[in-house]
């Protein structure tokens, strides 16, 4: 796989086979290549999460979705970030008919903190998006 990278990037790509953090780096490099993003201008968390929905780079290939139909998954655009997060939640069991407890469990696959899941559900309920 690392041979598919241009020669100057191969040493970095090779590390993808030796450690957990390097898998995130390799996934990030692949995403940058396909999206055309500027790697030096790309903001991210101290843990490596990127985009409006703060996905780890390895999650982009699994859950990233092209929400605006431009053929590119760019988690820094609202349509793609929303579509990607919706895809993530759907693949983890979200459905409209689920109970509040089931929905909370799905949200906690994204962020394990109880207060986070309760806040998201509370905000959604206040806006009429989720049945109480």
Where are the predicted features?
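Catalytic glycan-binding domains that act on GlcNAc-containing polysaccharides
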Residues: 1-132
């Amino acid at each position: 796989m690392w041979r598919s990278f241009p020669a100057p990037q191969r040493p970095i790509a090779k590390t993808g086979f030796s450690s957990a953090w390097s898998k995130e780096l390799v996934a990030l490099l692949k995403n940058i290549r396909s999206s055309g993003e500027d790697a030096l201008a790309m903001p991210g968390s101290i843990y490596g999460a990127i985009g409006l929905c703060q996905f780890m780079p390895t999650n982009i290939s699994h859950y990233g979705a092209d929400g605006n139909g431009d053929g590119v998954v760019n988690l820094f655009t609202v349509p793609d970030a929303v579509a990607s997060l919706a895809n993530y939640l759907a693949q983890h069991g979200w459905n409209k008919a689920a109970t509040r407890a089931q929905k909370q469990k799905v949200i906690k696959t994204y962020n394990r903190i109880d207060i986070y899941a309760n806040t998201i559900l509370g905000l959604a309920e206040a806006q009429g998006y989720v049945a109480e």
